[in-house]
Curated annotation (Swiss-Prot):
Pfam families: Ank_3 (PF13606). The keyword Repeat applies. This is Ankyrin repeat protein OPG025. Coiled coil: none annotated. PANTHER family: CYCLIN-DEPENDENT KINASE INHIBITOR 2C-RELATED, POLY [ADP-RIBOSE] POLYMERASE TANKYRASE. PROSITE patterns: ANK_REP_REGION (PS50297), ANK_REPEAT (PS50088). ANK repeats lie at residues 36-69, 70-100, 103-134, 174-210, 338-367, 408-437. The gene is OPG025.
Length: 630
């Protein structure tokens, strides 16, 4: 019993050789003796022991016919500094467990984390069938399934497939490989990065470079963790990596200069990563970096046309001013109208700051159209009202045609009505948008308002009623009225019930201002309602300024002429009235008063004593400012 403890203590302190071990065993010491759960062999074989003696190990094993072979901790042994490959072969031949997992990794993966692993050890273990990845997972492929067992409406050919199935993609391997463990541990002090080891591991399994962990390749981790050597980079590099992955690798490489002192950018690496470039991924990278120095370093190595890259960028899904500036510094030319029109073609490009930058800094091409097509901003379901309104204000001097229509006969105003954007509708109408357009399907701005107000939930319907009043208060033409009446009379709209009647009344009260007889003939059942409306019309006609009644002021005079009336006390008193039917006209009158005050304030701010503006007649100054700012 005493000899058992002596043998254990000698092994625990590594103070033993083969002869002393032999003597203790012959004196009755038992190599299978356990103390605190450890046998002498287990206590002896540890990474703390820098001098594991083969003859001691073999003696402790052979003396008990290798019954204690699995007390030899192979994980600990592989972490020691003096591994003997012949001893490993002997242990394996005697049946030591080599396929176990400890702390989530197998023995090959564990060995890869040591400071200077030997190729022969890798070969011995891998040839025994130990996997290069102990926890491999696979991706999946999405397979669309065409639905045939029920009827559905085919909105678009792209949606013929309405269900999906998933199959395992065995080519998409995911997990931490031996090579991964080798690479990520090389940044530790004293750890060697060997090209021979890397070449051997890749030759053992060619696909090892294509395993990913957390969606990143081994090259990504090499660039991130290690001091880069060209020859190792070339071995790990594969042009078949996705463009997205290559750009992530380039990003982490270029950012490394800010994380690590004395890190110098090797243009060979940059060029290699850009060599298999796709423009889309380069633009994605530029947007993700938001660092002008790094962006410029990429653009300097970009071998294709920077001008073409800029043209593609301004039609990209997200555009940043700093990226445009970097491209300009590298020789690209920004064109005011060409590039702003490209910018608008992408439906989600709506940053007023970008628009303002392009318009202020873009070059003008001689003999070009020099016009802006704002139509692409609008055919979308959701319009970002404040952003688009700011863009319209910026682009106002350059808009070619505010009433341009698309192939369906729809104008910008029509699209804004569909998206129930009140502020945009008011702006468009104030700036000359035609309320009388008719689409190729026969609908009008008034008609679509009525239909949407009838069909939508109450909260949205209220907005459409407000829009309907705004449009009608501008008085449509009789042709537009007749087309609207025909369109709404179509059975497919099913405008029935009290809600439909109230909407029709809103239309009638403005229609009679255009053609009284036609409306009375068309809607004879509403004569009583029309009579009530006439009382308010008569009131507006009775209130006059120098013989001009309020209806004439609101509907028959142009803006500069209206200015002569809006500050008149008679007009301002009338604008304070409350009508039952025509309050929208009162609202429009108050807007005129507010706009006039706004212009007067601007004139006062810039009209200094004796400057040229101050010498002009007030009416002329007001005319200049109204065209410039309203």
């Amino acid at each position: 019993m005493v000899n058992d403890k002596i043998l254990y203590d000698s092994c625990k302190t590594f103070n033993i050789d083969a002869s002393s071990a032999q003597s203790l065993i012959e004196s009755g010491a038992n190599p299978l003796y356990e103390y605190d759960g450890e046998t002498p062999l287990k206590a002896y074989v540890t990474k703390k022991n820098n001098n594991i003696k083969n003859d001691v190990v073999i003696l402790l094993l052979s003396s008990v016919d290798y019954k204690n072979i699995n007390d030899f901790d192979i994980f600990e042994y592989l972490c020691s500094d003096n591994i003997d490959i012949d001893l490993l072969k002997l242990l394996i031949s005697k049946g030591i467990e080599i396929n176990s997992i400890k702390n989530g990794i197998n023995i090959v993966e564990k060995y890869a984390t040591t400071s200077n692993p030997n190729i022969d050890v890798f070969k011995l273990l891998l040839d025994k069938g130990i996997p290069t990845c102990s926890n491999i997972q696979y991706g999946y492929n999405i397979i669309p399934i065409q639905c045939t067992d029920y009827i559905y409406f085919n909105w678009d050919d792209e949606f013929d497939y309405l269900d999906y199935d998933y199959t395992t993609d065995y080519d998409n391997r995911m997990g931490k490989t031996v090579l991964y463990y080798y690479i990520i541990t090389r940044s530790q002090d004293g750890y060697v990065t060997s090209l021979d080891v890397i070449n051997y591991l890749i030759s053992h399994e060619n696909e090892m470079c294509h395993y990913t962990y957390r969606e990143r390749t081994i090259l990504y981790y090499y660039v991130d963790k290690c001091d880069i050597k060209r020859e190792i980079f070339d071995v790990l590099f594969d042009s078949n990596y996705s463009g997205n992955e290559l750009m992530h690798i380039l990003s982490i490489y270029l950012r490394k200069q800010y994380r690590k002192k004395n890190h110098k950018i090797d243009n060979y690496i940059v060029d290699k990563l850009l060599s298999a470039h796709d423009t889309f991924y380069i633009l994605e990278l530029c947007n993700s970096l938001r660092n002008n120095v790094i962006i410029s370093s990429i653009l300097k190595r970009y071998t294709d046309s920077i001008q073409d890259l800029l043209s593609e960028y301004v039609s990209y899904h997200t555009v940043y001013i700093n990226v445009i500036k970097c491209m300009i510094r590298e020789g690209a030319i920004l064109y005011r109208f060409k590039h702003i029109n490209k910018y608008f073609k992408r439906f989600d490009n709506r940053d007023p700051k970008v628009v303002e930058y392009i318009l202020k800094n873009g070059n003008v091409v001689v003999n070009d159209d020099n016009i802006i097509n704002i139509m692409p901003l609008f055919p979308t379901l959701f319009i970002h009202e404040s952003e688009v309104l700011s863009i319209l204000e910026i682009c106002k001097p350059y808009i070619d045609d505010i009433n341009k229509i698309d192939k369906h006969g729809r104008s910008i105003l029509y699209y804004c009505i569909e998206s129930h954007s009140v502020a945009l509708i008011e702006w468009l109408i104030d700036n000359g948008a035609d309320i009388n357009i008719t689409t190729t399907y026969g609908s009008t701005c008034i008609g679509i308002c009525v239909i949407m107000a009838h069909a939508c939930i109450p909260e949205i319907a209220e907005i459409y009623i407000k829009i309907l009043e705004i449009i009608l208060s501008k008085l449509p033409t009789i042709e537009c009225i007749k087309k609207t009446v025909d369109y709404l009379s179509n059975d497919r709209h099913l405008l029935i019930g009290n809600k439909a009647k109230s909407l029709l009344k809103i239309c009638i009260k403005y229609f009679i201002l255009v053609d009284y007889k036609y409306i009375c003939d068309t809607y004879p059942s509403y004569i009583e309602y029309i009579t009530d409306c006439e009382k308010e019309i008569a009131d507006m006609c009775q209130i006059k300024i120098n013989g001009t009644d309020m209806l004439t002021v609101m509907y028959k005079l142009n803006k500069p002429t209206k200015k002569r009336y809006v500050n008149n006390p008679i007009f301002t008193d009338w604008a304070n009235k409350q009508y039952k039917f025509y309050n929208q006209i009162i609202y429009n009158a108050n807007r005129l008063i507010e706009q006039s005050k706004k212009i007067d304030n601007m004139i006062d701010e810039v009209s200094a004593d004796n400057n040229r503006l101050s010498t002009l007649p007030l009416e002329l100054r007001h005319l200049i400012f109204s065209y410039a700012f309203l």
